Every structure is written in C-alpha cells, then in structure tokens.
C-alpha cells in the first residue's frame, strides 16, 4: 500500500475521532434538569471507563460527585474527563472542589434535586466525598 494512501486513511480516522468530541463546555442551563449524564474517564492502563452519574448546576457551574469509586480516582488523577449528554460529547477539565463551604452547597443542591434517592444513595457511599466542578 502506498504511504500516501495509508496517511490518508489515518487522516480520515483522526478527523472522525476529533469531530465526535467538542472542546467547549455545553450550555449548563440546559443540563440543570437532566437526571443523569455519562462520564468517560481514563483508566491507569489507558482504557476508558463509562459511568452514569448525577449532575447539578449551581450559578452556571456544573458539578458531579463521588466517593470511593474507580472512576472518581481516574478523574482526580487525570484532572479531565469526557462528558456525554444528549447534545454531544465534551472534553472537559474536572477540578476537585476543596472549599468545605462550596462542597456543602453542592451536596445540598444534590439533596434538593434528587431528594430521597440522594438520601438512600448516601447510605452506600464509602470513602472520601469528592465533588468535581466541570470546566472547559
């Protein structure tokens, strides 16, 4: 096979891969009522892990949370993830929220949004509570 043809195929594959992931953050206001989103994190071996999680939007900022999970370890280690929502897939940074006051605000927002489901899920959370802010 001529090298130009193999280069052409590689270019097409690369273009397809890059076109499927947007690099700007979604309109968070459109996700405020979403019950779940999909987080794609990168495993230590380079593989991908797909996890369905809850999301809250506060003051035009989106947050996800976890405790004692592999996907949370991946996100904390890498500082980034891909977020899959009905509008598409987005490559984002995930900043761990360190402010206790901000964590409590986010936890309260989860409790308000998800109600007794959040209370019940809380019974099965183990390990450090981690809240991540999603940013471009």
Label every model-predicted segment.
Residues 68-136:
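Short, structured beta-strand-loop surface elements
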Residues 1-11:
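Bacterial N-terminal signal peptides that target proteins for export
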Residues 34-67, 84:
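Short beta-strand segments
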Residues 9-19:
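Bacterial N-terminal signal peptides
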Residues 22-26:
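Boundary at the C-terminal end of the N-terminal hydrophobic targeting segment
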């Amino acid at each position: 096979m001529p090298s130009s043809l193999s280069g052409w195929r590689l270019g097409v594959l690369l273009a397809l891969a890059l076109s499927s992931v947007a690099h700007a953050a979604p309109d968070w206001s459109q996700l405020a009522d979403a019950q779940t989103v999909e987080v794609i994190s990168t495993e230590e071996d380079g593989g991908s892990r797909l996890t369905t999680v809850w999301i809250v939007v506060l003051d035009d900022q989106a947050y996800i949370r976890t405790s004692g999970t592999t996907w949370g370890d991946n996100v904390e280690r890498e500082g980034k993830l891909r977020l899959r929502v009905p509008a598409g897939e987005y490559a984002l940074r995930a900043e761990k929220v360190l402010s206790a006051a901000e964590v409590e605000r986010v936890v309260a927002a989860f409790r308000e949004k998800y109600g007794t489901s959040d209370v019940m899920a809380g019974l099965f959370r183990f390990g450090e509570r981690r809240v991540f802010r999603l940013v471009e």
